[in-house]
Amino acid sequence: MTAPADLSPTLQLACDLIRRPSVTPVDADCQTVMMQRLGDAGFKLEPMRIEDVDNFWATHGTTDGPVLCFAGHTDVVPTGPLQNWQNDPFDALIDEHGMLCGRGAADMKGSLAAMLVAAERFVADHPDHKGSVAFLITSDEEGPAHHGTKAVVERLAARNERLDWCIVGEPSSTTLVGDVVKNGRRGSLGATLTVRGKQGHVAYPHLAKNPIHLAAPALAELAAEHWDHGNDFFPPTSFQISNLNAGTGATNVIPGDLVAVFNFRFSTESTVEGLQQRVADILDRHELDWHVDWALSGLPFLTEPGALLDAVSSSIKSVTGRETKASTSGGTSDGRFIATLGTQVVELGPVNATIHQVNERILASDLDVLTEIYYQTLVKLLA
């Protein structure tokens, strides 16, 4: 069934946002809707269009106190085959089981609606609150992420903008809303390795140098290496080869080079420079003719127990009756950019079981629970 007009304010807004087909990096006026609501609530608005990406920064309050920022993204991933969806992915239907169905329901238009409604209610209830409530919203999280949160954070840093705490609305929950929050993420370091040999005929190997044979022992050593032991907050650093390419397509030609693409997901126990040096040492030990192009997607970050994590955890407990688990598992998020400001960052959002899948859906009532958790967190930190 379609969403009726008597839905809660959070669900009404979530449905409105989902019905806007904002496939990355297109915003489809989602931010226009959000800024209109925030402006009406008394927020100062600062749109930031950077290249082809829409972003905005909004604040309510004073500059002489702590800043709690809600961060998120209006862009969604492509739908995939439409014929595999039970309904149009941008219809925002609530089915007979009470599930809100649509692209972005979990990732992360539901969170956007919940944080906005919570903030509206908070500034109405506490117009003279401490510090500031802020929003940092982008339409470039699911794509390259060059001109979104990263670029906005650089602008905020350049003018010494204060940002003490940040709640990112990523879908952190696994089974029940609030059962897991992310208090950090591993770093991501990618690499493209080229091992050079000498092309030749397979019948005359003495006249060639086979880069596959040369590289195989080194790749095996890299895959078997224990990079670190992790710590109380992070698992050990992982190394994975994702692509391996060599050969001309002919069966009688020894290739001239081999290209391997690999990735580290690394903990705070390792550094970029340390990992790069250890890779170089292994490759040199095997006497390879090699070159690596490195690509750092983000450094690891960690928010240890403190004001933000305590406020979020106690709010989840008071609203749901459940203890939450703090975790650093999963991929990267825009939290990695915000953490560079020295900000305490926690990710809290809906259940993530169907994110990026066809028939993405969440329990509709979870968004009202999430709204209350966000509201209680605001009260604990800024009232």
Swiss-Prot record:
Keyword Lyase in annotation: no
Key words of the record: Amino-acid biosynthesis, Cobalt, Diaminopimelate biosynthesis, Hydrolase, Lysine biosynthesis, Metal-binding, Zinc
One Pfam family, short name: M20_dimer
A single BP term in Gene Ontology: L-arginine biosynthetic process
EC number: 3.5.1.18
Binding positions (Zn(2+) 2): 107, 142, 356
InterPro entries attached to this UniProt entry: ArgE/DapE_CS (IPR001261), Bact_exopeptidase_dim_dom (IPR036264), DapE_proteobac (IPR005941), Peptidase_M20 (IPR002933), Peptidase_M20_dimer (IPR011650), Peptidase_M20A (IPR050072)
A single GO molecular function term of this UniProt record: cobalt ion binding
Record: residues binding Zn(2+) 1: 73, 107, 170
Active site residues of this protein: 75, 141 (proton acceptor)
Family: Belongs to the peptidase M20A family. DapE subfamily.
Record HAMAP family: DapE
Role of this protein: Catalyzes the hydrolysis of N-succinyl-L,L-diaminopimelic acid (SDAP), forming succinate and LL-2,6-diaminopimelate (DAP), an intermediate involved in the bacterial biosynthesis of lysine and meso-diaminopimelic acid, an essential component of bacterial cell walls.
This protein's name: Succinyl-diaminopimelate desuccinylase
